[in-house]
Curated annotation (Swiss-Prot):
Keyword Ligase on entry: yes
Annotated EC: 6.1.1.5
Residue numbers covered by motif 'KMSKS' region: 589-593
Group of enzyme by EC: ligase
Protein name: Isoleucine--tRNA ligase
Cofactor(s) essential for the protein: Zn(2+)
Binding site for ATP: K592
NCBIfam families per UniProt: ileS
One of the record's GO cellular component terms: cytoplasm
Length: 1036
């Protein structure tokens, strides 16, 4: 594709964007549907602190398609845009820019100053977001945006929290939760699940000495840094353990029997002492590894506990327990009154209790701890293990699990409501419902919602010194209790507010909400519910539709569901489309640092937004699968789909203007069979699109219209070209124009939600004076049942299947389509044969074959060969496959032909019979010399490849026509321009030209031909003969 084409595509789309803006078309679509049923849509809010990427453009395209379709289908579709403003993404940018990376740096800078800096950068890339949203062709209302940092939004978040609290679904507690040491704050379980990586970590087996010199317990861990906080060991009471003596060291070890070969693969290296049950080990004491907390021994520490979660598939069957750093450890130790110690601060560094490592980052201490254990003869094994480990989704630093005091939403109490809500949601793809999302709901844990951060919605809890709580649910309530005017709810405005009541002083707890709590409250907070627009909010709840990426099954989809189920016992949305991830072409994550993907702007400038939209919509990424992005793929969509459609429009416009066709004067026109076929295909497409869109299956909606463009351009127009060229104003020509006009107008409306630019361009060139101003103001087409002719569509499908079969044979055997052949034999069922009897000439034209023969049996020139399909039949018959192979090899042609017709056969193996069908058999053909054969799903085609002199001469004539018309196109001649030719060629080509002169001149609009005896002009190879032409335009 040349640069001029690329520039024109981009310029044309920019022109359409200007038209939409100048004429306010989006607002007119809303005005046009005022009073119609509302189609409610929730838009997942992005952060404007980062630039939009392909994932955002994909999700935006999906949302745009569904909303445009709903609007054209008669709904009022408000599309408010929202911004996620709070949380770590914003704070992290400010910390980096101001160098506030040390502990306490934000407090020294001032929380008020820090928050105001956050407020300043929230919309850093808002203009870029607006540009990309517009450029991709997406319509949203930027004039009515909602923002999570707005006072009204934050007040509604407070109302949501207060409502949950009133239902007994909020509590304070200490739990082990995912913790980001880089941010110094806990994260939720679903945040921890968003960024797992394959990493190499330490793998150590430690020797814990039983009291009274009774040997050592071996315990395995991948987190040596937690060993300083070891408070207990655990065994499975029902597992069998063994005691052995290491011959080299003389030490006695206890470990799980199943794990023995893993750590002692050489049977000669140890002496067997005996077996013992896990139950017999429970309660025994051991010596602390480190001295830091040995005083806890008096408080039930350093004992062996029972735990039924232990498996012997890895490790030693004995688990080291540091209750502050593992959820299972925490609960097991809590149950047995083992004390909790947590000598790690919020930055992940050891506190003063661990005097030998104080101030050291825990992951950095792994090697030092292992070295010390080795020096003290407490280390049995040291190595590395590769495994999946969670990283912070914002800072990309490793998470730890840490016991913290936090505020929780009691999600487990409402799990049954969430599961019930999920049952009523329509998921696309469907497997997400009970798969990724359903399983996540089944394993849902209480949600840690408090964050030790600054720029967020403050948790509205005020606490007195004696622990009494005041939970505030509105600004009015806070003003009444505090006596102060509230103008902002951020920390630096309300942290100093003290409430005095009943002789007590209440101060706010120092936490803000997890920013996912903000986005989960979005259905209500965007409208300031329940303080304003309550009726509107309730009428639009649950949303008819939402869409985001697969990662949101553990993010926004989840938090929406938690809050909606808890507050209203309903889902937050009825329908959802989940998209996959767009990767770089090499299969890696797209990375600015690696520069492994083209910028979205470059792609849209080069190939247009429609090409990008269609490339994404027609890919597996809309089925929640990963897509390796390829700019060649976008280019291919443009070349193979969009440009042919544009060419179809140009073809219609050229000849309609040439002959003065008026689409209003088309009454009582008798349509040709091919006209009826393309109209039937068109309205069948309308039905398929409507059905697919009702199921929110965009891939299924797009596929048929991409195929229809091929039907229209490469079959209907190509087959009907001479009808449009007819110089006489015949009824047939008017029928062709009328049909093509109807197809292009209706089709522009079908594709409008998906590829809105080319749809608008087509419509503007076709619309009449009284038609709506824009294609997007039109109703989506309805099925016209009387125009749908299934038998005709099936017949044309058969014809095209045969033609494709014939072309594949020509390609396989290097037979040019322009070279005529004498015969083709089409073998099919009797019913198909009768239906196709009248279209032999059409098939002959397409395949460039003189005689088309329809047969019920394979002709004598071909022998049909069958053999077992080993892959499928092997599973069915097992070791009897060789017998079947011999039986099939001996079948006569009559039986094979019967199988070809029926698709089934019975094979006798002695007294036993086995039924076989088409999937059990592979078919091939042995052809006589000069013949080739191939089959499709319904037909066998046999081509007679023998060339006679007349066929050879006609082949040369057709090549001449092709080359002359290529030269016409290269010279950019008008379709009606006449030409004169000077030709230099060998005798055989001159003879072919003379023999087929009338045909050649008619096809190329040539008025005169001169044969010259010297080379001049462009040289061509005509079936192995060197030929040169000079082509000149002549006046009529």
């Amino acid at each position: 594709m040349d640069n001029e084409d690329k520039i024109s595509i981009s310029a044309k789309e920019e022109k359409i964007l200007s038209f939409w803006k100048e004429q306010d078309i989006f607002q007119k679509t809303l005005d046009n549907r005022e009073g119609c049923p509302t189609f409610s849509f929730y838009d997942g809010p992005p952060f404007a602190t980062g630039l939009p990427h392909y994932g955002h453009l994909l999700a935006g395209t999906i949302k745009d398609v569904v909303c445009r379709y709903a609007s054209m289908d008669g709904h009022y579709v408000p599309r408010r845009f929202g911004w996620d403003c709070h949380g770590v993404p914003v704070e992290y940018e400010v910390e980096k820019s101001l160098g506030l990376t040390e502990p306490g740096a934000i407090e020294r800078f001032g929380v008020a100053n820090f928050n105001e800096e956050c407020r300043k950068i929230v919309f850093r890339y808002a203009d870029e977001w607006k540009y990309f949203v517009d450029r991709i062709g997406r319509w949203v209302d930027f004039s009515a945006t909602w923002r999570t940092m707005d006072l009204s939004f934050m007040e509604s978040v407070w109302w949501v929290f207060r409502s949950l609290y009133d239902q007994g679904l909020v509590y304070e507690g200490t739990k082990v939760v995912p913790f980001s040491t880089k941010l110094g704050t806990p994260l939720s379980n679903f945040e921890a699940g968003q960024n797992y990586k394959e990493v190499d970590d330490p793998s150590v087996v430690v020797k814990f000495a039983l009291q009274d010199n009774q040997g050592f317990l071996l315990a395995w861990t991948t987190t040596p840094w937690t060993l300083v906080s070891n408070m207990a060991l655990a065994v499975h009471p029902e597992l069998t353990y063994v005691r052995i003596k290491d011959k080299e060291s003389g030490d006695e070890y206890i470990l799980g029997q199943e794990s023995l070969p893993r750590w002692f693969p050489d049977r000669e290296s140890y002496e067997w002492i005996g077996q013992l049950s896990g139950k017999s080990l429970v309660g025994q004491s051991y010596e602390p590894l480190f001295p830091y907390f040995q005083d806890k021994k008096e408080l039930e520490a350093f004992r062996i506990l029972p735990a039924d979660f232990i498996e012997e598939s890895e490790g030693t069957g004995i688990v080291h327990m540091a209750p502050a750093f593992g959820e299972a450890d925490f609960f097991a130790c809590q149950e047995h009154n083992v004390p909790l110690v947590c000598p790690v601060d919020n930055q992940g560094c050891y506190t003063a209790e661990v005097k030998d490592f104080v101030g050291e980052y825990i992951k950095s201490a792994d090697k030092g701890i292992a070295r010390r254990l080795k020096n003290e003869n407490k280390l049995f094994y040291q190595g590395t293990v590769r495994h999946r480990y969670p990283f912070c989704w914002r800072t990309d630093s490793p998470l730890i699990y840490k016991a913290v005091n936090s505020w929780f939403v009691a999600v487990e109490k409402v799990k049954s409501k969430m599961l019930k809500a999920n049952e009523s949601i329509h998921w696309t793809p469907e497997h997400i419902k009970q798969g990724r999302f359903g399983k996540w709901l089944e394993g849902a844990r209480d949600w840690a919602i408090s964050r030790n951060r600054y720029w967020g919605t403050p948790i509205p809890i005020w606490r007195s010194d004696d622990g009494e709580l005041l939970v505030i649910g509105s600004i009015q309530e806070l003003e009444a209790l505090s006596g102060q005017k509230i103008v902002d709810l951020h920390r630096h405005f309300i942290d100093e507010i003290e409430i005095n009541q009943n002789g007590k002083s209440f101060r706010r707890i120092p936490y803000v909400f997890d920013c996912w709590f903000d986005s989960g409250a979005m259905p209500y907070a965007q409208n300031h519910y329940p303080f304003e627009r309550a009726e509107e909010t309730e009428a639009c709840f649950p949303a008819d539709f939402i869409a985001e990426g697969l990662d949101q099954t553990r993010g926004w989809f989840y938090t929406l569901t938690v809050i909606a189920a808890a507050l209203f016992d309903q889902p937050a949305f009825k329908n959802v489309i989940v998209n996959g991830i767009i990767l770089a072409e090499d299969g890696n994550k797209m990375s600015k640092r690696l520069n492994n993907y083209p910028s979205p702007k470059m792609i849209m400038d080069a190939y247009g937004a429609d090409a990008l939209r269609l490339y994404l919509l027609n890919s597996v990424v809309v089925k929640a699968e990963d897509l390796r992005f390829s700019d060649k793929g976008v280019e291919s969509v443009l070349k193979q789909v969009l440009l042919p459609l544009s060419n179809a429009l140009a073809f219609y416009k050229t000849y309609a203007e040439l002959y003065g066709f008026d689409p209003k004067e088309t009454d009582n026109i008798e349509l040709a069979e091919i006209d009826r076929w393309i109209l039937s295909s068109l309205y069948s497409l309308v039905g398929k699109t409507r059905e697919s869109m009702s199921q929110y299956d965009l891939h299924a909606a797009v596929n048929p219209f991409v195929d229809f463009i091929e039907d229209l351009t490469n079959w209907y127009i190509r087959r009907s070209r001479r009808r449009f060229w007819d110089a006489e104003d015949s009824a047939d020509r008017r029928a062709a124009f009328s049909t093509l006009y109807e197809v292009l107008v209706v089709f522009s409306k079908v594709i409008a939600p998906f590829i809105p630019f080319i749809a608008e361009d087509m419509y503007q060139q076709l619309r009449g004076e009284t038609d709506p101003e824009s294609v997007h103001l039109c109703d989506f087409p309805h099925v016209v049942l009387e125009k749908i002719l299934p038998d005709l569509e099936r017949k044309m499908q058969d014809i095209r299947e045969i033609v494709a079969l014939g072309h594949s044979l020509r390609k396989e055997h290097k037979l040019k389509v322009r070279q005529p052949l004498q015969n083709v034999y089409i073998v099919g069922s009797k019913e198909r044969k009768e239906a196709l009897a009248q279209v032999g000439s059409l098939i002959g034209e397409e395949l460039n074959v003189k005689d088309v023969h329809f047969c019920s049996e394979t002709p004598e020139y071909v022998t049909t060969l069958i053999k077992p399909n080993f892959r499928t039949l092997g599973k069915k018959v097992g070791n009897r496959l060789p017998e079947i192979q011999r039986a099939l090899a001996g079948l006569p042609q009559e039986q094979i032909q019967a199988f070809m017709h029926k698709g089934q056969m019975v094979v006798s193996l002695g007294e036993e019979t086995i039924s076989l069908d088409k999937e059990d058999i592979t078919v091939s053909w042995a052809s006589a010399e000069g013949f080739v054969a191939r089959s499709s799903a319904s037909f066998v085609a046999v081509l007679d490849c023998q060339l006679t002199e007349p066929l050879i001469m006609e082949g040369i004539a057709r090549e001449l026509v092709n080359k002359i018309n290529t030269m016409r196109r290269n010279r950019k001649l008008h379709v009606s321009d006449r030409i004169a030719i000077r030709l230099h060629a060998p005798v055989i080509v001159q003879e072919a030209f003379a023999l087929h002169k009338e045909y050649i001149c008619e096809e190329t609009l040539t008025t005169s031909v001169s044969v010259i005896d010297y080379k001049e002009g462009e040289e061509w190879d005509i079936n192995g003969h060197a030929v040169s032409f000079v082509l000149e335009r002549v006046e009529r």
